[in-house]
Amino acid sequence: MTAKLEKVLIANRGEIALRILRACKEMGIKTVAVYSKADKELMHLGLADESVCIGPASAAQSYLHIPAIIAAAEVTGATAIHPGYGFLAENADFAEQVENSGFAFIGPKAETIRLMGDKVSAKHAMIEAGVPTVPGSDGPLPEDEETALRIGREVGYPVIIKAAGGGGGRGMRVVHKEEDLIASAKLTRSEAGAAFGNPMVYLEKFLTNPRHVEVQVLSDGQGQAIHLGDRDCSLQRRHQKVLEEAPAPGIDEKARQEVLARCVKACIDIGYRGAGTFEFLYENGRFYFIEMNTRVQVEHPVSEMVTGIDIVKEMLSIAAGNKLSFTQDDVVIRGHSLECRINAEDPKTFMPSPGTVKHFHAPGGNGVRVDSHLYSGYAVPPNYDSLIGKLITYGTTRDEAMARMRNALDEIVVDGIKTNIPLHRDLVRDEGFCKGGVNIHYLEHKLAGEKH
């Protein structure tokens, strides 16, 4: 590795911090772990070369506190910073400050994060690159009522109004009939201004029963980009993914190959650097771009399992200034992989369930991978996201991956706190999901049906 990547500070916690640390160690890169006062017991702290406390339990004063993270990098002589996912991973100001302070940011350039973070400019960039997008206002929804109503008519109801600065399911409102459009637009504008500091909204056609299919890409920022196939993340609750798989089952092959090629072209067009994900809605054999995630994703392991490519190591290599070490022809999608997100939460009410893990036993066997920072005696703090691990299986077929996941879910033991493992045990035996190709409303409808 070049001097650029001699020592990496991992600006995150939990399972992803451990995941990044493992990749660094494999590549002979020194590591710096940072942690809040609530996270003194994190597993990766003992494995890192150095660890630095960056503040109190509150994320705003620790994992989101840019000066503390940059100071930790300076004190330890780190040469690069990996943001992981969540926290500051898609914060363009952070990426900029990291680079301006003389460190390498393991991710895209700040201007790329800005471009893709604003949903309106992102959509423009995708239209220019030939990536299929959802029909809509193709820019901010005009405040002029007549023009707005005309756009609504052209797109056809139902439509969805979205905040340009929103994301993760926040800042959106569905409008079913024309007479509600203007009031809904005003309401979303004022909410967006308050929540995101940006009142701009745009309008899109609302797809009623789509699937969520995304494309994983790697791009070296030096003119070369490749895709690692697609993933299906349609099993969601409140816009949060619960279970993911690769490749997406039952997709029209011609549409798939076309969208994969367009995503690669888009990376080259925008000068993308690092790992990224293009998220699409897929309905009636067509793809519609929704957003691009400019970071490593929670569900990256399923793509690793079916391609044999280590996404985090590639991110590190690209950040060191290397070109991609392989071409698209070298990428072969083999078999099938599933991932269950294990959360510390009540499986019925979904309320967080922090506390001490009395006993943890990880499942094993052929084609089983566990990405988790849990250990017996570890106390899950109440301050952060409830994700405590990911259970990943691989099989030569989807059925085999599913059978292995059933076994793994039956074997795993997490005592002392409540988890959503019972929900996953149910899902991998659910007839609709086992058939493949369920839409993004499937899980919520299933859960609602069980309540009544």
Feature map (PLM): residue ranges:
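Catalytic cores of soluble metabolic enzymes centered on carboxylation/carboxyl-transfer
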Residues: 301-452
